Amino acid sequence: MSSTFQLDTSTSRANPTPQPMKRLTVPHIRARKVNGETKEPLVMLTAYTARQAQLLDRHCDLLLVGDSLGQVIYGLPSTVPVTLEMMANHGAAVVRGSYHSVVVIDMPFGSYEASREQAFESAAFLLKQTGAAAVKLEGGEAMAETAAFLLARGIPVMGHVGLTPQAVNTLGGYAARGRSDAEADKIVNDAVALDKAGVFAIVIEGVVEPIAIKATGAVGAPTIGIGASAKCDGQVLVTEDMLGMFERVPRFVKRYEDIASVIDRTVATYAEEVRDRSFPSEDQTYQP
């Protein structure tokens, strides 16, 4: 599909004209898993800005406007302080910058746990403000009824089990889950409960590989791993992590590039040229 996409290469910072490529839908994603198998794994990355979305869109099946933006964009210590307004602002930008991927937006901590009605109000707000296709919420069996409530009212839901960052204060850190029998059973049961509720996909995060594989085989919905297993039905990473924007990243991250070093070298060159007055040159100035 990506071969028909023409990446906008204009110098304008304005949004490019939409390309002749049909946007994927939630049913497309759900249908990728047939009889318990996904022939081509789903590709998902996080996106927080329109330009980032433009660059990622043709390579991905899904773009996740993750509440990880709290740490990545705002420098917050965790995802807990992220607000609905933050998510709405970034979600709208990502939708404007994409034409192919299914855009999923995280429901931030405190926006859906109190009641199913609260969850619906928050999810409806996010979808109306952004144009995103679906919301993602953390939690398994405890959130299954909420997921079903949203689905019955026209809001597609992606689930999230295993290590759930919004519960970091309860979990006591970011250690991998599923090492004990009790944890392993809970992860599988959580995934099954969400699947029965009708979610179209389930993120499995920070889970020991055998349990991630077991959970994937136990559900009809595609699973998307992050620190889980290559045998999940897809994968997701925080884009800035895989690009090498940060010195410290979780063990499960593969750095495909060292963009931080590229930026450092580039800015150092710019600063040097400004200080020695070699920038701007005649090529960058207007003459009479």
Where do the language-model regions lie?
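Alpha/beta enzyme core
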Residues: S2-P288
